[in-house]
From Swiss-Prot:
Keyword Metal-binding: no
GO MF annotation list: DNA binding
Pfam family, one: YbaB_DNA_bd
Native species: Chloroflexus aurantiacus (strain ATCC 29366 / DSM 635 / J-10-fl)
Name by which UniProt lists this protein: Nucleoid-associated protein Caur_0522
Keyword DNA-binding among record annotations: yes
PANTHER family: NUCLEOID-ASSOCIATED PROTEIN YBAB
Family: Belongs to the YbaB/EbfC family.
Amino acid sequence: MNQRQLMQMAQQMQRQMQKVQEELAATIVEGTAGGGAITVKMNGHREVQSITISPEVVDPDDVEMLQDLLLVAINDASRKAQQLAEERMQPLTGGLKGLF
């Protein structure tokens, strides 16, 4: 393989990577907690897009529970976004884990 072919392959891979990054930005995953009382929507770049809180879990006397549920929902969405990114990048990275 000559240098020109290597450059073409690198450019093609760069275009594919850009496409996957755009897809990740547009793909939404959901994390939930409290049986769906809290829902966090996050894109494939792990940017929170929205948080929905059911009025039933808003108790001024138990703010700590609400905070805990939010953490669980955010972490759930983050794990799903990470898994999504790994799955989408796998064809480009040859299955090397931990790159994205």
